[in-house]
Amino acid sequence: MKVCTDACLFGAYTANTIKHSTSNLQKILDIGSGTGLLSLMLAQQIDAEIDAVEIDRAAFIQAKENFEASHWAFRLHIFNTDILNYTTGKKYDCIISNPPFFEDDLRSDDEARNAARHDTTLTLIQLLSAVNDHLSKEGFFFVLLPFHRVDFFEKESLAYHFHLNNKILIRHTATHPYFRAILVFSKSKLTETTTELIIKNENGVYTEEFVDLLRETYLQV
């Protein structure tokens, strides 16, 4: 499961937003953490306790190794379980998820890849239910979605009384259609904003906005 540009973008945006938030976000939950990329990106920039939940055994083992090899191992915790079975006595200030599925996209013959790219292990509605169970009253939920699932997700979120705060629509270039979106929800109603982020210019060079966003994560993009 290789690292994707949109996942790095999501991690950088989330870390930057939390870091500059006026809220005290000290307890973070990463749902469907995979090999731990997002948790590591947040731990690099935010002094918070991060719990990660990953159902796939191989990804869990890799994430555990990645966490233990990092400078922030004492703040990173990984659990090999289904988020629907995850129990804890705490409520989280922030929940992040890059859902391990892309509904309606082409399936592969590899079962592990299917589980990582499709709704075979967790549906969007189940994700919302899990977030509702674990998010604190004043907490925030960051999620990265395929663009074609955004309207559905926004509609379903209303059943859990989530309020959309920020929507970032992402496209490869100015002439490409949107392919991903970052959504930020809370249980409290705040001012909603929608912005656009373009990854590369017409010459195939990363845009200044993209580079600035990832600057604190990477020394060179």
Task: Give a label for each model feature.
Residues M1-T17:
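S-adenosyl-L-methionine
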Residues A12-G89, C94-S97, E103-S108:
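Conserved SAM/SAH cofactor-binding pocket of Class I
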Residues P99-Q126, A130:
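Mobile active-site "lid"/loop adjacent to the S-adenosyl-L-methionine
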Residues T175-V221:
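SAM/dcSAM-binding transferase cores
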Residues V3, T121-Y178:
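Conserved Class I SAM-dependent methyltransferase catalytic core
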Residues W72, L158-H161, T193:
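Short, structurally constrained coil/turn elements
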Residues F10, N98, L127, F185:
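Residue-level signal for inorganic ion chemistry
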